[in-house]
Regions:
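The beta1-alpha1 cofactor-binding region of Rossmann-like NAD(H)/NADP(H)-dependent oxidoreductases
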Residues: 43-44, 68-79, 110
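A glycine-rich helix->loop->beta "capping" turn
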Residues: 58-63, 83-94, 102, 140
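A short, exposed helix-loop element centered on a Lys and neighboring polar residues
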Residues: 128-129
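Residue(s) in the substrate-gating loop at a strand-loop-helix junction
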Residues: 149
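Active-site loop immediately N-terminal to the catalytic Tyr-X3-Lys motif
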Residues: 154-160
Length: 160
């Protein structure tokens, strides 16, 4: 049985939503009759992803929103939450999915690790802090999904 937040007319926001697992989830939500917002830093991917979602969404392009967001910046994520509220009236599902894995290893440049943590850890925290209060205020069933990767748990062979 699906979660009650996964209902027609409800709103799903997916960070890192213009490709991969994020786009697959957004496509699924649009197919359920939900309105979707994909937030992604990749400007080159958003238009094609939006067109794909509009072809699946019951309301077409009117049920699809895209936004350029760097989840490592709280102000970007808070601005996204405000924009979704203005466009769709609020959020029922937040999928904190944005993540990076630049070429690095345990002994790689400190800047790589700082960027990884800024996106993969702080991005989740920023999303939750920006969206959860209004989701709770709405008094409806809501859902926050935080995705991850086994790369964050294990070290791949050849990568010290």
């Amino acid at each position: 049985m699906p979660h009650p937040a996964m209902s027609p007319g409800n709103v799903a926001v997916i960070t890192g939503g213009a490709s991969g697992i994020g786009l697959a989830a957004a496509t699924h939500y649009a197919g359920l009759g939900m309105k979707v917002c994909i937030a992604d830093i990749g400007a080159d991917r958003r238009p094609e992803a939006a067109a794909k979602l509009a072809s699946v969404a019951r309301g077409g392009a009117a049920d699809v929103m895209t936004a350029a967001v760097d989840v490592s910046r709280f102000d970007d994520v808070a601005g996204l939450e405000t924009a979704v509220q203005k466009r769709f009236g609020g959020t029922d599902i937040l999928m904190n999915n944005a993540g990076i894995g630049p070429d690095s290893n345990s002994f790689g440049p400190l800047e790589n690790w700082q960027r990884i943590l800024a996106v993969n850890l702080w991005g989740v925290i920023h999303g939750t802090q920006a969206f959860a209060p209004h989701m709770i205020e709405r008094g409806r069933s809501g859902l926050i999904i935080n995705t991850g990767s086994k790369q964050g748990i294990t070290t791949p062979p050849g990568n010290p």
